[in-house]
Curated annotation (Swiss-Prot):
Belongs to the helicase family. RecQ subfamily. Residues 1-72 form the Helicase C-terminal domain. Residues 100-147 are annotated as: Disordered. This is Truncated RecQ DNA helicase-like protein C212.06c. Residues 125-141 have a biased composition (Low complexity). SUPFAM superfamilies: P-loop containing nucleoside triphosphate hydrolases. It comes from Schizosaccharomyces pombe (strain 972 / ATCC 24843) (Fission yeast). PANTHER family: ATP-DEPENDENT DNA HELICASE TLH2 (PTHR13710:SF149), DNA HELICASE RECQ FAMILY MEMBER (PTHR13710). Truncated ATP-dependent 3'-5' DNA helicase.
Amino acid sequence: MGVRLVVHYRLPASSMDYVQETGRAGRDGKYAIAALFYEKYDSTWSSYVEDSMKNFLNDNTMCVRSFLASEMDGECVCYSLLGEESTVSTMYGVKPTLPETPKPAIATHSRYNASFSSSPPPQPGSSSGMSAMNTNTTSTTPVSGKT
């Protein structure tokens, strides 16, 4: 059984860390995905992230394979897989950037009180027994940032 998915939910400190961690996926020769999610916070970008990693993330035209190879041994030809030079966005048909700033939202989650009585729990849609179960509906309220 091999690793099918590697997810980074923050920036690795170095490009070598990224290479090592994403290299775990697909070692058995089967299809695998490596996903990197990050936000550009000043504190994140200022201290611990290497310049090569910053340059890679800022350049939407750089081939991922080329970057990884340049960090290892420097040998890579991007078009060796496709027969022509290509970027990540054209290879996989994805848009390489995310929307600027998503609006934050406050979510409330449903909660149910447990009742350890001998009677069965109330059935959905029935009016009897509804007082025994306290429900709060799930809602999402956008935060506008204005008061």
